[in-house]
Amino acid sequence: MSDTSLTHCSEVLLTARNLCADRGGRRVLEGIDLSIGAGEVVTIIGPNGAGKSTLLKVLLGVEPYSEGQVIRKANLCVGYVPQRMPVDAILPMTVQRMLRLAKEVDETAMLAVLEETGVAHVLHAPLQGLSGGEFQRVLLARAMLRNPQLLVLDEPVQGVDYSGEVALYQLIGALRKRHGCGVLLVSHDLHMVMRDTDRVVCLNRHICCTGTPDHVSGHPEFARLFGDQALQTLALYQHHHHSCTHHMPVDVAIDPQEQA
């Protein structure tokens, strides 16, 4: 099963071809074919242990793969929001200081992106004192500071309450529309993300099924992995699908702690 569905008007940002990865003598990714275009939202779903986070890190170039190809647009700039980022309680750090760790940070741009993500009020606050929603928005602001062509998010609503989840997904959608960046998202929140997703990739070490939410909702592999209740939830959403290579290193900054 491959996922290379792009509309003719979409510039390809990143492509995986027959991608395989092994960890500890075990194959964790098998024959992945995947492309994402400019302005497109692609959501990767799958059970625990399906290889979702591994796939993201392989695509970003921070973990190795065993076979296949990863092809990125020349000079592709990526903003990355990790699944988790440990905060050292012994060494307090403010939001401003963390954002200043990025290369060539412009103070005006920093304030603007914090305003855009709704957390300008925490500029001088310690990271340890932020709520779950505030912390995720700060990580999103850090990613957007790079003016990315591709925004990659690994379970971005962890530690966020229900109302915060809704608001955060709405913010991600607004950033995509405003900046025109592609979005590659890993999520378990089927009832949240499917409404605004262009394509769904159902992963369980290999791509089980892929396509629009409407297409995936009718696929037997989706029902087998997630059950009839999830299928019915996904089918509730009406979807409107909208919508060419260089081997180059990706321009993405990921802290060593985030790769653990």
UniProtKB/Swiss-Prot annotation:
It is found in: Cell inner membrane. It is an enzyme of class 7 (translocase). GO terms for molecular function: ABC-type zinc transporter activity; ATP binding; ATP hydrolysis activity. One of its GO terms (cellular component) is plasma membrane. ATP binds at G46, P47, N48, G49, A50, G51, K52, S53. Transmembrane segments: none annotated. One of its GO terms (biological process) is response to zinc ion. Pfam families: ABC_tran. SUPFAM superfamilies: P-loop containing nucleoside triphosphate hydrolases (SSF52540). SMART domains: AAA. The complex is composed of two ATP-binding proteins (ZnuC), two transmembrane proteins (ZnuB) and a solute-binding protein (ZnuA). PANTHER family: METAL TRANSPORT SYSTEM ATP-BINDING PROTEIN TM_0124-RELATED, ZINC IMPORT ATP-BINDING PROTEIN ZNUC. Part of the ABC transporter complex ZnuABC involved in zinc import. Responsible for energy coupling to the transport system. Belongs to the ABC transporter superfamily. Zinc importer (TC 3.A.1.15.5) family. This is Zinc import ATP-binding protein ZnuC.
